[in-house]
Amino acid sequence: MMSAEETVTQNAPNTVQDQVEASVDAAVHASAEQSNTPAQQADDFRVFVGRLSTSTKKSEIRSLFETVGTVRKVTIPFRRVRRGTRLVPSGIAFVTFNNQEDVDKAIETLNGKTLDDREIVVQKARPVQEQPIKDRKKSKNKNGEEPETSTSVENAESAKGSSDENEANTATAPSSNEANGVDKKQNEIKGKGGSGKNKAKPLPPNSIYVSGLSVTLTNEGLKEMFDAYNPTRARIAVRSLPPYIIRRIKLRGEQRRGRGFGFVSFANAEDQSRAIEEMNGKQVGDLTLVVKSAVFREDKQNDENEKNENEPIEASESAPTNVSDSTEPKASEVDSEEKSGVTASAITA
């Protein structure tokens, strides 16, 4: 028969083990309950703020909403500017309160109020559970901080965090796939032109180079000037302009200002020769025409003869033998509407 001391000694380990297991179970159960409650409360006590100015700061929003209750946090989603990596405020925000009473009061009191000269909208935020699940990626701004962003109201409303500085949705920076897509597109554009630069295309046979033209002369005017020699086409070399300016000019039905020279093509060599002989040196208004034959230059520079003997030389790389550099034509600057066959590969006397 065991003594009382032996019985206590034998049962002690089981008693301690039972107590430890019970305390662990209780702690796990309590933590599970606590993990669900704050998230649900954060979702229930949020309001959506719209029509904000992009210059409005968190502190200004917090100051306004603290007039109706205690503000737990303020979230301003950001969005990525199209075709860039710069982030700008999306013009909305989310304010989280501690209770439903403050939420109702904020909606009733602050909806329609003016903040930074903007009449804001205050509404109940949609719970996260009702929002569609979307992929989210993180990126960092120049300071190494994770910026807030939102490509839609749904994404913005799903933002969570523990403080005002680290609480918002993160921006989606251009991924490597997107970057590759841009590079691929650029390569395709380059592929069409052979290289990144605009290659000069050879002029049709029997073409001439004409300088001393008015900068306001149009293609039609140039062709009419040589009408007696049966020209097949005429093109003015135009000034380089940004693409958006070119689009505006075309929308207005206007022609870009010329550079004072152009090219005219003829049906046969006889008409070309007559045009050069009769029009070279002719006075047109205050200007004197210089008319020369536009042909391929077969010789370039010493070591490049064999390499480029069959390739057309861009007009920007060569000029008439007795024409100044100021009138040197660039193939990329001739009217883009009729590029093929218009730009001179080279011009010689």
UniProtKB/Swiss-Prot annotation:
Protein name: Single-stranded TG1-3 DNA-binding protein
Single GO BP term: mRNA cis splicing, via spliceosome
Main location: cytoplasm
Stretches assigned to the RRM domain: 45-127, 206-296
Chain segments carrying region Disordered: 121-208, 298-349
Keywords annotated in UniProt: Chromosome, Cytoplasm, DNA-binding, Meiosis, Nucleus, Phosphoprotein, Repeat, RNA-binding, Telomere
PROSITE patterns: RRM
Polar residues: bias regions: 168-179
Compartments in which it is found: Cytoplasm; Nucleus; Chromosome, Telomere
GO (cellular component) term, any one: nucleus
The keyword RNA-binding belongs to this UniProt entry's keyword annotation: yes
Residue ranges with Basic and acidic residues bias: 181-191, 298-310, 327-340
Single annotated GO MF: single-stranded telomeric DNA binding
Chain positions with Phosphoserine modification: 152
Record's function text: Binds single-stranded telomeric sequences of the type (TG[1-3])n in vitro. Has a role in meiosis.
Database matches in SMART domains: RRM
